[in-house]
Regions:
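Structural motif
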Residues: 47-51, 133, 172
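Hydrophobic alpha-helical segments and helix pairs
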Residues: 97-142, 147
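Phosphate-binding site of ATP-dependent enzymes
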Residues: 143-185
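Conserved N-proximal alpha/beta basic substrate-recognition cap immediately N-terminal to
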Residues: 8-111
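Short loop/edge segments at beta-strand edges and connector loops
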Residues: 31, 84, 114-116, 149, ...
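Extreme N-terminal starter segment of soluble prokaryotic enzymes
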Residues: 1-4
Length: 185
């Protein structure tokens, strides 16, 4: 059976392709910016592996997750097997959903407030334990993670020219948890 690799970043798919070649498994590269989906056609038979990233926008693929959703919905409507389906994609692009699922599973997450505007961010920080961090709801690679020791630092950043909004417009204000130097990550 043929494998189809849905992605937007060749760097991440090379190790998989190398392994598939060693196993002599046929595969096809489905870079989302090259894949054309015709809903009147049936997708090919095979196994589809979704390797979409929340940080695709930093590589110039702003709408890759949305287009991947189109692809996955099309595949699922034809009963194709998708590894990392729409549920995985939803988790990948939303820290809010990640935190909710972690908490549901009994894994404690830091206190987090999700803000859709600069005003919400500044207001929410007033009653927040210091220090705290901000981060992007939809991101990877540590995008948008900043440490603030007090309200003034945050306001200066948010009102200044270096403020970096999340690609989905949601910035997280989060309790800062200092790393334990005895723990190796």
């Amino acid at each position: 059976m043929k494998a189809y690799i849905i992605h937007e970043n060749e760097v991440w798919t090379k190790p998989l392709e190398s392994h598939l070649n060693k196993l002599e498994v046929g595969y096809e590269d489905w870079h989302v910016e090259k894949a054309k989906i015709d809903l009147s056609q049936s997708p090919p038979e095979g196994i589809f592996y979704n390797r979409m990233s929340a940080s695709s926008h930093v590589r110039g693929h702003r709408f890759a997750p949305e287009y991947t959703s189109v692809i996955i919905n099309w595949l699922k409507s034809h009963k194709r097997r998708v590894i990392n389906d729409g549920n995985a994609l939803a988790l990948e692009i939303s820290k809010s959903l990640q935190y909710l699922k972690l908490n549901e599973s009994g894994i404690k997450t830091p206190r987090s407030i999700f803000c859709s505007s600069k005003e919400q961010l500044i207001q929410s920080a007033r009653d927040f334990k210091k220090p705290f961090i901000t981060k992007h709801n939809r991101a990877g690679r540590g995008l948008g993670v900043k440490l603030f020791n007090n309200q003034n630092e945050l306001e200066h950043y948010v009102k200044g020219p270096n403020f970096e909004n999340s690609i989905d417009g949601i910035t997280i204000l989060q309790e800062y948890i200092e790393a334990d130097p005895k723990v190796i990550h």
